[in-house]
């Protein structure tokens, strides 16, 4: 079983988009893959339970089926930071609870588990703990999605520096253009290639529609076939 954690430089960096495409790429190569969205806020009621749109996308993209509460064990209605939403709901999120939920995912029989984080890298799960501590404890290799927009240099470099300080195994990063009108897009991309200490896996240009899977040819070569 191969396991990966997909994080982003910020909220809306494109984590779900990338995780979904990775799941589809693995499916193309006959791999049994499942997505895991441990924490989600901004959920809505459906079928008598809170569900998250991003988690549903991961379920639709996966080749291994599982019940919703296995894919997204912590779901909250307010579109706010999960640890604040959890406190309001009277729910305590701990690393042990996350690991217990993750064991349920491992029992689904997948060859690959792709865990999508929430928000950016430094996401609190409580007043005293962060999601990245759980990622380190589980020894998950990380893929960083850089949302290409104004401010991405600072966000990406700070994230990378923190990962390195923790000894996190970041296997690479993906440039995802979220702002179609970004000034000096190529110059920013070149700056990130020069400065980030991890290899670039793929570039996803901005599109009103979901980019074709061919965009991820490099990602396919680096991830789906060689991991």
From Swiss-Prot:
Residues holding ATP: 12-17, 54, 116-119, 176-177, 205-207
Record: residues binding substrate: 41
UniProt subcellular location: Cytoplasm
Tagged with keyword tRNA processing: no
SUPFAM superfamilies: P-loop containing nucleoside triphosphate hydrolases (SSF52540)
Primary site of residence: cytoplasm
Keyword Transmembrane helix in record: no
Enzyme Commission numbers on file: 6.3.3.3
Gene Ontology CC: cytosol
Keywords for the protein's UniProt record, in alphabetical order: ATP-binding, Biotin biosynthesis, Cytoplasm, Ligase, Magnesium, Metal-binding, Nucleotide-binding
CDD domains given in the database record: DTBS (cd03109)
Catalytic function, reaction form: (7R,8S)-7,8-diammoniononanoate + CO2 + ATP = (4R,5S)-dethiobiotin + ADP + phosphate + 3 H(+)
Binding-site residues for Mg(2+), renumbered to this chain: 16, 54, 116
Pathway(s) per entry: Cofactor biosynthesis; biotin biosynthesis; biotin from 7,8-diaminononanoate: step 1/2
One Pfam family matching this protein: AAA_26
Subunit (UniProt): Homodimer.
Described function: Catalyzes a mechanistically unusual reaction, the ATP-dependent insertion of CO2 between the N7 and N8 nitrogen atoms of 7,8-diaminopelargonic acid (DAPA, also called 7,8-diammoniononanoate) to form a ureido ring.
Name this polypeptide is given: ATP-dependent dethiobiotin synthetase BioD
Annotated source species: Pseudoalteromonas translucida (strain TAC 125)
Lineage of source species: Bacteria, Pseudomonadati, Pseudomonadota, Gammaproteobacteria, Alteromonadales
């Amino acid at each position: 079983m191969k396991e990966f954690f997909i994080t982003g430089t910020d909220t809306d960096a494109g984590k779900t988009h990338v995780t979904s495409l990775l799941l589809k790429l693995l499916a193309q190569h006959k791999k049994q893959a499942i997505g895991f969205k441990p924490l989600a806020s901004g959920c809505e009621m459906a079928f008598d339970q809170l569900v998250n749109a991003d988690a549903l996308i991961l379920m639709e993209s996966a080749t291994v089926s599982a019940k919703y509460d296995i894919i997204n064990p912590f779901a909250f209605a307010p579109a706010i930071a999960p640890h604040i939403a959890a406190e309001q709901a009277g729910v305590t999120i701990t690393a042990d609870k996350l690991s217990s939920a993750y064991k349920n995912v491992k029992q689904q029989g997948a060859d690959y588990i792709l865990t999508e984080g929430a928000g950016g890298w430094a996401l609190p799960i409580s007043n005293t703990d962060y999601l990245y501590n759980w990622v380190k404890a589980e020894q998950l290799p990380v893929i960083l999605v850089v949302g290409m927009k104004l401010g991405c240099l600072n966000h990406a470099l700070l994230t990378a520096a923190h990962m390195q300080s923790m000894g996190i195994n970041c296997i690479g990063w993906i440039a995802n253009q979220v702002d179609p009108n970004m000034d000096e897009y190529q110059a920013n991309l070149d700056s990130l290639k020069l400065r980030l200490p991890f290899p670039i896996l793929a570039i996803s240009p901005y599109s009103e529609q979901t980019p074709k899977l061919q965009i991820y040819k490099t990602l396919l070569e680096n991830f789906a076939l060689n991991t």
